[in-house]
Amino acid sequence: MYNVRTDLAVESREIYKHRYNREIDGVVFEEKTVEEDIKVTNVDILNEEGAKAMEKPIGRYVTIDIPDYTHYDGGIMDEVSHVVAASLEELINLPEERTALVVGLGNWNVTPDAIGPKVVGKLMVTRHLKKVMPDIIDDSVRPVCAIAPGVLGITGIETGEIIKSLVEKIKPDLVVCIDALASRKLERVARTIQISNTGISPGAGVGNHRMQINEESLGIPVIALGVPTVVDAATIANDAMDLVLDEMINQADAGKEFYNILNNIDKNEKGMMIKSLLDPYVGDLMVTPKEIDDIIESVSKIIANGINIALQPNMVLEDINKFLN
């Protein structure tokens, strides 16, 4: 069977529904529009049956769809940050005095994969200040620490091993991970933010399966945030072929032999054929927008502000920005 590569729970549900023409047992879906043109979708996987169908762990997956002009509008960016913060606050059940560790996953040398390290560079980190300036930084400020551990190819160390060692040493009460994801649809690239309470597997979106970073492996809750920055080239080619076939079917005379041939093409077999044809030439090629540098810069700011607001509930964004500046 042709498996479409995606990290987004909302897309996994769409693929299943399209393939089997029914909803998934054990999965609850809720969609709402907040603020201006910002859509929030909650996908709750409740049991093993739902997890197997979705190919994702049991838990909540929040998808925030943002307008395509967000990256060029500071006001909309701040609105999205507050939506991200509100979604995070629903998943973070942590007293203010407890420590949070934020981890920016990804390779800072590869732009589509650099969103995690970029977010870390924009965070309000306070754990060290709580120790060296206790008279100035009061109990209303949460101790937050952050790290961008790089990738296995740079460090020679599994990212999960680095994080586990840090957790054992500094003993945080929560880990928040940020990583780049893969999407099934081009229109979701850099326009979707996924938040989940199930942890993350670094590199899974592009086929590099590493050690899981979740509550089971670390012993504390793990919140994962991700933004799709790449799409599988075979998926793009398959979608383009679907558009061509649909148009040819619309133009053909219904009931005629050519119409019947087009209408009976197995889309699953077509997908596998395109994948096998492309493999010798491009392998696992991933495609990203040409303006990805600007996109990563703006999306990382949105996510960093959202995390800052969620982890520091006693501060407003204006005060956080003053602190950072």
Swiss-Prot record:
InterPro entries: Pept_HybD-like_dom_sf, Peptidase_A25. Autoproteolytically processed. The inactive tetrameric zymogen termed p46 autoprocesses to a smaller form termed p41, which is active only during spore germination. Keywords: Hydrolase, Protease, Zymogen. Residues 1-7 form a propeptide. Its EC number is 3.4.24.78. SUPFAM superfamilies: HybD-like (SSF53163). It catalyses: Endopeptidase action with P4 Glu or Asp, P1 preferably Glu > Asp, P1' hydrophobic and P2' Ala. The keyword Hydrolase applies. Gene3D superfamilies: HybD-like. One of its GO terms (molecular function) is metalloendopeptidase activity. Pfam families: Peptidase_A25. GO terms for biological process: proteolysis; spore germination. It is an enzyme of class 3 (hydrolase). Initiates the rapid degradation of small, acid-soluble proteins during spore germination. Homotetramer. Belongs to the peptidase A25 family. This is Germination protease. It comes from Clostridium perfringens (strain SM101 / Type A).
